[in-house]
């Protein structure tokens, strides 16, 4: 078939490197030295994407159903789930189209494949940017709720949250369109890498500051009750472990992808870098894994959301319960229309 290279690399705008060998395991580089290439089966990749898709759809549906969750904090969580849903969905769509093209089931012209290529690239890039932005927005929201607790509801009003959400979506779509259009410019890839590092630093600084404040608060309670200091140390260790897991998962899942982009800029022809380029699909798989983990960290820890999630699962077999579930039925994509929480 013609167009074989284009079919095999619909996400080629961000993976602008020599095509990896199709044989898994140890591939040889130009010097004949072994080069580790980890093969991700298409079935596994699609399965992970499907898990992420279902998981994030449930989060969006649960937040949309329960009016008690219609607050600025849950609006950010809702939009994080929606962006993660688009990340997994766009990658699943890309993989499915590639498989259909290679099997000859889907026959189309090269111009159509190129249009699909551009559309999926923009969708993937914009959803990735949105996911990173909403992770940062959640960190900022939690920081304000701790350090400005008495003024939180006057600072994080729903109209402000709506404007922030709309700005993130618009900026992400416009930026991704520019990035995909000028992907062959090193400055574009470096901008993506700098943006990732900025989000990483922002989250690290805010969460470390929140941990320090929590430890100070715990120490004050210990002194008030004349308890022993080791209890405070234990609390600090648990908090540090939680923070390490949160930031560690973020870095391990997103870091390799942006390392790939960095190497594309600085050593596109280097033998060692070429070995890393061969594992591009592994880096995408790690991002899909992050979209699976995000709801576990940010959404499912809420007891109210877990309770609503059970109702949503029950509602799947009883359509009428959406009108009786204590909240307006909101279209899952309309995160910016969520209202404030009901008074107690």
Swiss-Prot record:
Predominant cellular place of this UniProt entry's protein: membrane
Disulfide bonds: none
Protein's organism: Callithrix geoffroyi
Cellular compartments annotated: Cell membrane
Top-level taxon of the source organism: Eukaryota
One GO CC annotation: plasma membrane
Gene this protein is translated from: MC1R
Official protein name in the record: Melanocyte-stimulating hormone receptor
Annotated Pfam families: 7tm_1
UniProt keyword Cytoplasm, yes or no: no
Keywords in alphabetical order: Cell membrane, G-protein coupled receptor, Glycoprotein, Lipoprotein, Membrane, Palmitate, Receptor, Transducer, Transmembrane, Transmembrane helix
Residues on Cytoplasmic side: 64-72, 141-163, 212-240, 301-344
Family, per entry: Belongs to the G-protein coupled receptor 1 family.
Residue ranges crossing the lipid bilayer per the database entry: 38-63, 73-93, 119-140, 164-183, 192-211, 241-266, 280-300
Lipid linkage positions (S-palmitoyl cysteine): 315
Role this protein plays: Receptor for MSH (alpha, beta and gamma) and ACTH. The activity of this receptor is mediated by G proteins which activate adenylate cyclase. Mediates melanogenesis, the production of eumelanin (black/brown) and phaeomelanin (red/yellow), via regulation of cAMP signaling in melanocytes.
Any one GO MF annotation of this record: melanocyte-stimulating hormone receptor activity
Keyword Ubl conjugation on entry: no
Membrane topology listed for this record: Multi-pass membrane protein
Extracellular topological segments: 1-37, 94-118, 184-191, 267-279
Assembly and interaction partners: Interacts with MGRN1, but does not undergo MGRN1-mediated ubiquitination; this interaction competes with GNAS-binding and thus inhibits agonist-induced cAMP production. Interacts with OPN3; the interaction results in a decrease in MC1R-mediated cAMP signaling and ultimately a decrease in melanin production in melanocytes.
InterPro entries: GPCR_Rhodpsn, GPCR_Rhodpsn_7TM, Melcrt_ACTH_rcpt, MSH_rcpt
Glycosylation sites: 29
Gene Ontology BP terms: adenylate cyclase-activating G protein-coupled receptor signaling pathway
